[in-house]
């Protein structure tokens, strides 16, 4: 939540609460009312994230099948002064749909990068509305694997894809 949005909600909520208290005291006579407000200021966790490049090496286009060329997508997440251990992760990037899955887009038509959870090779959601909860002591391990659209004839050449990792409190 951004600071501006929270401030607006607090001011509106406090205004409604004050008006309600004023109208009740006017109807019931003059009585003092104690009011206790608790406000939680939500700030992003103080984490640092260091990513790395995933090198797939030389690939044979006909062997790109969503299994071959799987590589660890290593990163370092450090949240030493975090207020809580329960966090959530979001991966953002340009995506496309290949064979029914949302994958990272590359600069080669018909080629994408599938991001997987290393624990079971399941698809790791990529997108603005996809958050994955985790505990700082058990961070998700990711893998990247090239995928080819059914029937695609991949052009030879280097390819690129990138993603951004966002970490926040649950």
Swiss-Prot record:
It comes from the Bacteria. GO terms for cellular component: pilus. Residues 1-28 form the signal peptide. Pfam families: Fimbrial. Induction: Expression is negatively regulated by H-NS and subjected to cAMP receptor protein (CRP)-mediated catabolite repression. GO terms for biological process: cell adhesion; cell adhesion involved in single-species biofilm formation. Disruption phenotype: Deletion of the operon under classical laboratory conditions does not result in any major effect on E.coli capacity to form biofilms compared with the wild-type strain. InterPro entries: Adhesion_dom_fimbrial, Adhesion_dom_fimbrial_sf, Adhesion_dom_sf, Bact_Fimbrial_Adh_Pro. Keywords: Signal. Part of the yfcOPQRSUV fimbrial operon. Could contribute to adhesion to various surfaces in specific environmental niches. Increases adhesion to eukaryotic T24 bladder epithelial cells in the absence of fim genes. The operon is cryptic under classical laboratory conditions, but is functional when constitutively expressed. Belongs to the fimbrial protein family. This is Uncharacterized fimbrial-like protein YfcR. It comes from Escherichia coli (strain K12).
């Amino acid at each position: 939540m951004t600071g501006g949005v929270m401030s607006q909600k607090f001011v509106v909520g406090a205004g409604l609460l004050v008006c309600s208290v004023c109208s009740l005291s006017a109807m019931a006579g003059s009585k003092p009312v104690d009011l206790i407000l608790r406000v939680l200021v939500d700030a992003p966790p103080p984490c640092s994230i260091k990513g790395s490049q995933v090198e797939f090496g030389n690939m044979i286009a006909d062997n790109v099948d969503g299994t071959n060329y799987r590589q660890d997508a290593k990163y370092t997440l450090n949240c030493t002064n975090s207020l809580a251990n329960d966090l959530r992760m979001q991966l953002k990037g340009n995506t496309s749909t290949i064979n029914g899955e949302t994958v990272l887009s590359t600069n080669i038509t018909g080629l994408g990068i599938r991001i997987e959870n290393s624990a079971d090779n399941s698809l790791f959601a990529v997108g603005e509305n996809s958050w994955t909860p985790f505990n700082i002591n058990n961070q998700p391990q990711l893998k990247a694997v090239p995928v080819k659209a059914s029937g695609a004839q991949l052009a030879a050449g280097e390819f690129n894809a990138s993603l951004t990792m966002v970490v926040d409190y649950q």
